[in-house]
């Protein structure tokens, strides 16, 4: 019997593309494990799917009657893109500053501006997708914070019953990735073929119009490699993350398949069944090909350090998975309520810190303090020339009580710069105005 694994000539050439793909995947993994989103990409896209038929599509048709099936499918791709846009900067060629601003500064105002600025069906779908990310992070991060504390007793002993992303980024990455993987293992998410059928699109023109209105900075000045960032993010969403999920599933599948039914889970599964149109649930993930098995073997023995830490996730416990399922139900309920407010032109979004779900204020969260200081410095460098009255009011309100323990105070030089920049802003700013009108 001939057991030759690789013969000369054509067989060698046939393995080269796979070797290149493995190398590419490993390289991008090294570059991309830094997201602070409450949910991973698959969950964000699933939130859109859960309300697509009953809520989102009717909104699109109400504003843009007569859409064809192809136009609706294309709009679905833009909704997917909007659902993950706040995390774009955390991927290769992105800008952490871009995503930090959307997470910690005027998070509600940004989504509101996308809705106001949208001009066609794809831009509108993109904005509605961004609204789903807002709902997801506000509802999802508190659950993830609690889950991290449950899964990591040492962190719970140090930080209490809720561990924030800034307090242990690796633990958050492992927990979030674990949640996505267990849902895939149990065939709950749309197949890769379905996501390929829909696609993934980013509305750059809408971003370019809305971003400077909200943050007083041109998009190109923050996201300097915009096309490369969007392209690499599209690859990560459509190929890398599903591939890494399959690899994780291959190494953890026995433990992940166990079910513990309860009311919250039954509600979640019922919602999944109602959104089950034109889908094959998860089959692409539970039948790994040869390439996935080889990559799984390689990564199984890779030291779980640095960017590979996320692949060493702890399987969710029944308690933490229940928290996750409840947070999904809460997210869907909240997103549905927001979409109804969009329909009735009554939408008002609070500016919340995405990592905690709490209203944004100074000294509430370290990354928020740091991000405000960086934005203030950037605006001051340009003499606040693009800062709207609303943005000026927002910054002055954030720094209205300088007695609280703002994170920036730990750097004396930087804090003195903040005080100087605030004086310059106060000299330019008119009296504070009332909050803006609802979005439509």
Model-derived segments and spans:
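Bacterial N-terminal signal peptides
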Residues: 21-32
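N-terminal secretory signal peptides that target proteins for export/translocation
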Residues: 1-17
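A short structural micro-motif
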Residues: 134, 227-231
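Catalytic glutamate of the conserved HExxH
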Residues: 130, 134-138
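Short, surface-exposed recognition loops or helix-turn segments adjacent to catalytic cores
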Residues: 220-228
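Phosphate-rich cofactor/ligand-interacting catalytic cores and adjacent structured alpha/beta frameworks
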Residues: 241-264
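N-terminal, motif-rich segments that launch catalysis or mediate targeting to/interaction with membranes
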Residues: 36-125, 138-220, 250-254, 266-440
